[in-house]
Amino acid sequence: MAEKTITVEEVLKHNTRDDLYIVVKDKVYDISKFLDAHPGGEEVLVDLAGRDASGPFEDVGHSEDAQELLEKFYIGNLLRTEDGPQLPTTGAAAGGSGYDSSQPVKPAMWLFVLVMVVAYFAFRKYVLK
């Protein structure tokens, strides 16, 4: 029997606490019934609803037991198309905070930090004599 394929459009529809799909390594999982049992709390999973959770899943370093448990919720393989919608992975569009840790710190931020450090030491040297 051929494995079921699930489109990106379908995954995007399942993004609520009661109806929650995630994708890990192009496999789709319906984890709606696992929320209460998740050791990291349900909010972690709700934040990943309807999106590609491969990065966060790998970053946590789940045990083999956790990986085996995930397979119990497997419902099919993700069908990606070039011209179709893409699954969000990070940022506000995906329901996250909007912070993307993969982006480098901008030079202006480094300049700000440098100015603050210099100001701190100047204050200590000249004001707090």
From Swiss-Prot:
Annotated heme binding sites: 38, 62
Subcellular location as annotated: Endoplasmic reticulum membrane; Microsome membrane; Mitochondrion
Keyword terms: Electron transport, Endoplasmic reticulum, Heme, Iron, Membrane, Metal-binding, Microsome, Mitochondrion, Transmembrane, Transmembrane helix, Transport
One BP term from GO: ergosterol biosynthetic process
GO cellular component: endoplasmic reticulum membrane; intracellular membrane-bounded organelle; mitochondrion
SMART domains: Cyt-b5 (SM01117)
Pfam family, one: Cyt-b5
Protein topology in the membrane: Single-pass membrane protein
SUPFAM superfamilies (alphabetical): Cytochrome b5-like heme/steroid binding domain
Parts of the chain that traverse the membrane: 105-125
This protein's record includes keyword Transcription: no
Domain called Cytochrome b5 heme-binding: residue spans: 3-79
Broad class of the protein's primary localization: endoplasmic reticulum
InterPro entries for the chain: Cyt_B5-like_heme/steroid-bd, Cyt_B5-like_heme/steroid_sf, Cyt_B5_heme-BS, Cytochrome_b5
One Gene Ontology MF term: metal ion binding
Family: Belongs to the cytochrome b5 family.
Record's function text: Membrane bound hemoprotein which function as an electron carrier for several membrane bound oxygenases.
Protein name as annotated: Probable cytochrome b5 2
Record organism: Schizosaccharomyces pombe (strain 972 / ATCC 24843) (Fission yeast)
